[in-house]
């Protein structure tokens, strides 16, 4: 069997001012290789694609490489970049004439001129290969699934985990289901439903968070005869597009009405449990009062509003600014992306004093540029993994590294700040440990991303965690992200009905 394998993966925050260009993909994972050996070696132990390749190898299937492009979440993808990658995919498919196409897609990509990026990509491929060549794709748990995507894919499998530790497993299942279909000859039918909701990502953890009962219910349905797959999606709230929000896909070998009934049931479940996705946000003045009232404790202040894995620019200063203003000391900050300050630090060298404006340079949504006088305490240039979380569930996560570029640790009177040249996620690692810094010396940590992810990596000390009421394009209060112009209406909580 000849299998075309590729991917296009980006979670697009349409409220983020930073456009996603080709360099954004190359900084994460990008390959356009005709050579199978080069392609398979590139994805030898990566988070994505590896699951497809290993299972195809088990069946001795031939791999036909397609472009594979993965970028860290940010703003709109430049049209020329997407069109070039799509056209290259179509050229490769037309030339190689595969028996099946396997793709790793996010499901929440937005391109200039293409709101439904994955729908456009899948429909373009289906128009080329026809009904006789199936298209199987894996989607992120936070995909904004559209009817066009469902119509043009023969099978869509969503991740069942947050954090996303089952990517390889789901890719492998795609290949296994295809071979089962070849062997048994069953015909699959897929149904879809979408409730009128827009949910924040902050509490979508599948290990006790709001998505836990949905995944459990999906697994129960999958025990029924004829049910191939049930995928509930939390959706991504930072994309202003028509189908932003949660959805459900169900694929069966029985009547499609069976699949639709399952989708409708879980859709109603989303409506009934919608409030479980919204978390309490702690006002910063109360956080400061709490810290001052019990200074011997350790605190972690989570900034989800500037989450780099949700498209935030990661140069937000709002929380740090308020803590400094409130007289808080011994602060450790992970991270602020600022190329100017990084360059200044590297030119000055370790031990030097630098003065400048830190952060707040992407837009006016994440705080002001802070005037600083700081000592350059560390300069680092080395690869750092994306994940180091412990536990059996992370055993097959993959050795994915992120391009931090140059890293400078600068120290002011009140804070040590990790400043990066590139925007990077740190929620699944203890960045301080990788920089040979003992995070226990800080009274307060300021961390960007999901609190539940950080807890796994700062478990050596008991912290009091606060999810701060902050500002930014990932605000868990979805009514405060920005003006939604394209999403279907009415939708909760934007219309509060």
Give, region by region, the residue ranges found by the protein language model.
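Low-complexity, highly charged intrinsically disordered N-terminal segments
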Residues: 53-81, 85-92
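Active-site histidine-anchored catalytic micro-motif
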Residues: 4, 8-11, 15-16, 25, ...
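Extended hydrophobic packing segments that form well-structured cores
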Residues: 271, 388-497
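Hard-cation-handling environments
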Residues: 202-414, 418-422
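Glycine-rich phosphate/diphosphate-binding loops that line cofactor/substrate pockets in enzymes
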Residues: 2, 58-61, 65, 91-101, ...
């Amino acid at each position: 069997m000849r299998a075309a394998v590729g991917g296009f993966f980006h979670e697009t925050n349409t409220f983020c001012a930073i456009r996603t260009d080709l360099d954004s993909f190359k900084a994460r994972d990008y390959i356009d290789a005709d050579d199978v050996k080069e392609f398979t070696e590139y994805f030898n132990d990566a988070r994505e694609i590896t699951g497809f390749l290993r299972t195809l190898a088990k069946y001795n299937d031939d791999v036909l490489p397609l472009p594979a492009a993965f970028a860290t979440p940010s703003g709109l993808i430049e049209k020329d970049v997407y069109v070039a990658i799509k056209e290259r995919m179509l050229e490769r498919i037309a030339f190689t004439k595969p028996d099946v196409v396997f793709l790793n897609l996010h499901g929440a990509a937005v391109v200039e001129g293409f709101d439904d990026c994955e729908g456009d990509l899948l429909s373009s491929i289906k128009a080329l290969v026809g009904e006789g060549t199936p298209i199987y794709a894996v989607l992120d748990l936070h995909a904004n699934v559209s009817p066009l995507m469902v119509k043009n894919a023969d099978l869509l499998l969503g991740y069942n985990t947050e954090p996303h530790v089952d990517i390889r497993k789901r890719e492998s299942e795609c290949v296994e289901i295809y071979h089962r279909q070849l062997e048994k000859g069953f015909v699959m039918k897929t149904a879809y439903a979408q409730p009128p909701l827009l949910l924040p990502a902050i509490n979508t953890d599948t290990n006790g968070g709001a998505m836990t009962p949905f995944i459990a219910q999906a697994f129960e349905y999958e025990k029924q005869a004829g049910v191939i797959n049930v995928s509930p999606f939390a959706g991504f709230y930072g994309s202003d597009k028509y189908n932003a929000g949660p959805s459900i896909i169900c694929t069966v070998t029985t009547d499609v009405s069976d699949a639709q009934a399952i989708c409708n049931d879980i859709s109603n479940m989303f409506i009934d449990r919608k409030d479980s996705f919204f978390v309490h946000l702690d006002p910063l003045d109360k956080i400061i009062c709490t810290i001052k009232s019990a200074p011997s404790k350790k605190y972690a202040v989570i900034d989800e509003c500037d989450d780099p894995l949700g498209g935030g620019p990661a140069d937000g200063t709002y929380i740090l600014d308020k803590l400094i203003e409130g007289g808080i000391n011994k602060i450790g900050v992970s991270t602020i992306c600022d190329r100017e300050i990084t360059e200044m630090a590297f030119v000055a060298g370790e031990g030097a004093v630098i003065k400048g404006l830190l952060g707040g340079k992407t837009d006016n949504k994440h705080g002001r540029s802070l005037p600083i006088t700081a000592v350059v305490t560390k300069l680092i240039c080395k690869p750092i993994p994306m994940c180091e979380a412990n536990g059996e569930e992370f055993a097959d996560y993959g050795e994915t590294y992120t391009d931090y570029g140059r890293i400078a640790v600068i120290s002011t009177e009140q804070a040590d700040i990790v400043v990066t040249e590139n925007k990077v996620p740190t929620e699944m690692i203890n960045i301080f440990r990788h920089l040979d810094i003992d995070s226990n010396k800080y009274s307060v940590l300021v961390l960007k991303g999901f609190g539940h992810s950080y807890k796994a990596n700062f478990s050596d000390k008991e912290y009091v965690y606060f999810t701060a009421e902050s500002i930014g394009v990932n605000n868990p209060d979805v009514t405060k992200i920005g003006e939604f112009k394209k999403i279907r209406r009415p939708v909760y909580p934007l219309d509060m009905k």
